Amino acid sequence: MTVKKLYFIPAGRCMLDHSSVNSALTPGKLLNLPVWCYLLETEEGPILVDTGMPESAVNNEGLFNGTFVEGQILPKMTEEDRIVNILKRVGYEPDDLLYIISSHLHFDHAGGNGAFTNTPIIVQRTEYEAALHREEYMKECILPHLNYKIIEGDYEVVPGVQLLYTPGHSPGHQSLFIETEQSGSVLLTIDASYTKENFEDEVPFAGFDPELALSSIKRLKEVVKKEKPIIFFGHDIEQEKSCRVFPEYI
């Protein structure tokens, strides 16, 4: 079985210090990075990967003022970038979705999770537990009343949608390997690799455990060597220029 359609859906932008993309750089320059959600149309039903930024980020570039990342992260989010409004544009309500896949629970990937009170949210156990107590996680991203489906390690969501455990950027990050009807195999690294340079040249970037992150990149390289998928990175400005976005699909 394969995924009928894989949509790339823009979900706002985020100004991030360039030292977060390349740890060797001196902090002080901000990059304007894309924030993505991904919609998978499968035989079993629609699956959403990540939910963008929280409502508290709408028109609020100073969201992180007074925190340890003040001046290093500036969300650029409008009302249109709220996940419920994104879903309306693609023809769905929150309860229409089969699953939410949370690649990890950082603010720009799980900020909209609270809109899904019934839909199962698939997350790694190590990520869920880290988000309960580590300071880099916002409370909007680890709400207690949601329908979490806690997994451990690699996991097949439905035929053609495989989660790959890629910790390092965060304690329980997961990437996706997808078999699509139109384009063949696709690897979504998400934040296991922000950019092509992080992946191909193993340029270190921001994260929980740099050595573990490098191990995950090496693991994904083995997947690429064997399966030869199309690769999409988590926040690559250059790759963004050639991405086909909704309503186009791959």
From Swiss-Prot:
Record's cofactor remark: Binds 2 Zn(2+) ions per subunit.
Annotated positions binding Zn(2+) 1: 104, 106, 169, 191
UniProt effect for mutating residue 207 to W: Small decrease in KM value for hydrolysis of GBL and C5-HSL. Larger decrease in KM value for hydrolysis of C10-HSL
Gene3D superfamilies (UniProt xref): Ribonuclease Z/Hydroxyacylglutathione hydrolase-like
GO molecular function, one term: acyl-L-homoserine-lactone lactonohydrolase activity
Residues at which Zn(2+) 2 binds: 108-109, 191, 235
Documented effect of changing residue 207 to D: Small decrease in KM value for hydrolysis of GBL and C10-HSL. Increase in KM value for hydrolysis of C5-HSL
Enzymatic reactions: an N-acyl-L-homoserine lactone + H2O = an N-acyl-L-homoserine + H(+)
InterPro entries per the UniProt record, alphabetical: AHLLactAiiA, MBL_superfamily_lactonases, Metallo-B-lactamas, RibonucZ/Hydroxyglut_hydro
Resulting phenotype, residue 104 to A: Abolishes activity
Cofactor(s) needed for function: Zn(2+)
Outcome when changing residue 206 to W: Small decrease in KM value for hydrolysis of GBL, C5-HSL and C10-HSL
Alphabetical keyword list: Hydrolase, Metal-binding, Zinc
Segments forming a coiled coil: none
Matching Pfam families: Lactamase_B
EC number per UniProt: 3.1.1.81
Function text: Catalyzes hydrolysis of N-hexanoyl-(S)-homoserine lactone, but not the R-enantiomer. Hydrolyzes short- and long-chain N-acyl homoserine lactones with or without 3-oxo substitution at C3, has maximum activity on C10-AHL.
Homology family: Belongs to the metallo-beta-lactamase superfamily.
Matching NCBIfam families: AHLLactAiiA
Subunit structure: Monomer.
Name of the protein: N-acyl homoserine lactonase AiiA
Species, as recorded: Bacillus thuringiensis subsp. kurstaki
